[in-house]
Amino acid sequence: MDDRLILMGVIGRPHGVRGAVHVTTYSPDPEGLAELPLRDERGRRVGLAWTGAGIARVTIGEGDEAAAIADRDAAAKLTNLRLYVRRADLPPPEDEDEFYFADLIGLHAVGPDGAALGTIRAVHDFGAGASIELSDGSLLPFTRAVVPEIDLPGGRAVVVRPVEVEMRE
């Protein structure tokens, strides 16, 4: 079972006076976020019910212990609350060439000749295209030209460093 927690969204500022909040999602399917078993940093179950684009009502807790956030003050206390889901609870990718960015973290990065380049430490996406960060601190564009092969079962990714990337020694 894969218990890694994947950040899926963040609760923002309150919306109105009845406990609704703005929610920033990191999911390609923001509506589907409400269907996932979300948890916060403390492990509490967080439920979302969308009321508009990026606006949701929130419940904290499970079963009989679940409490609906019903006023602006309670909603304000949730500002910046991070919403996670266990990797095992995410649906499998639909295509064999698809994967979650989280699955890349920890893969061994090897050159086309098989030489070890380190491991993938992080995947960043700041809006202009994803990039991978290697354990040596290199930040490379996550494109098919730079990462032509990903072997999840084998735990490795082939990385072709672009010519214009300076090498540090």
UniProtKB/Swiss-Prot annotation:
Record localization: Cytoplasm
Family: Belongs to the RimM family.
GO BP terms in the entry: ribosomal small subunit biogenesis; rRNA processing
Protein name: Ribosome maturation factor RimM
GO cellular component: cytoplasm; ribosome
Gene that produces this protein: rimM
Keywords: Chaperone, Cytoplasm, Ribosome biogenesis, rRNA processing
Subunit details: Binds ribosomal protein uS19.
Keyword NAD on entry: no
Function in brief: An accessory protein needed during the final step in the assembly of 30S ribosomal subunit, possibly for assembly of the head region. Essential for efficient processing of 16S rRNA. May be needed both before and after RbfA during the maturation of 16S rRNA. It has affinity for free ribosomal 30S subunits but not for 70S ribosomes.
Entry remark concerning the domains of this protein: The PRC barrel domain binds ribosomal protein uS19.
